[in-house]
Amino acid sequence: MWFDSHCHLKIFSDREDLENVISRATDSQVLKMITVGTSLKDWRLYANLVEKYGDQSDYTVGLHPSYVGSFWENELRTLYDYWLMDRAPVALGEIGLDFFRLPKDKRLAEEVVDFQKEAFRTQLEIASVLKMPVIIHSRNAFRECVKIIDESDFDWNKVVFHCFSESTKEIMEINHRNGWVSFTGILTYKANEHLREALRATDLDRLMLETDSPYLAPIPKRGKEN
């Protein structure tokens, strides 16, 4: 049996193909999928989906760093509502920092980074109050993510770095803090030997696998829908 710790089912729901996707997952011995929230655009959808597909799925809610804008505080105020539902989220995420595509204008870039950091800190505080694990999105921002988590005194035992893309050095830092890591299909890409080395250095009891569906299909289906 398999457990997909991180996927995004919205695209399949939008094109009315979700029933087929879940059926194929079940046929492939995928016991359960966690569909991960990224913004207001999918939180309510996922809460509704688990009402129908609760045996096969759980969900999370969180504000992805790429969707953090000037109104992020208002959006985060609605997060608590989901923990009042009959089927509450199993984690808060995905949250974190993404410095991969910042504005070229220095002032705008600094503003985006500041928004992301403040939203990240706030969501860690919310997760701490709710006693929930967090799913971390970190792209070109590993050092900054670790620093903010450390400064927040958040329980590292409840931290999952999703789609891990760093090296053995960073894995050892997470191991030392008792955090978790999750690997995707990019592990199979030829250029990612550093990831395979990192996998070998991961504490087995802290290792998770994910599809990040519909993204990041492994070899030989790289570039296609996952």
What does each of the following model-derived ranges do?
Residues 1-226:
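Mid-domain alpha/beta scaffold segments of enzyme catalytic cores
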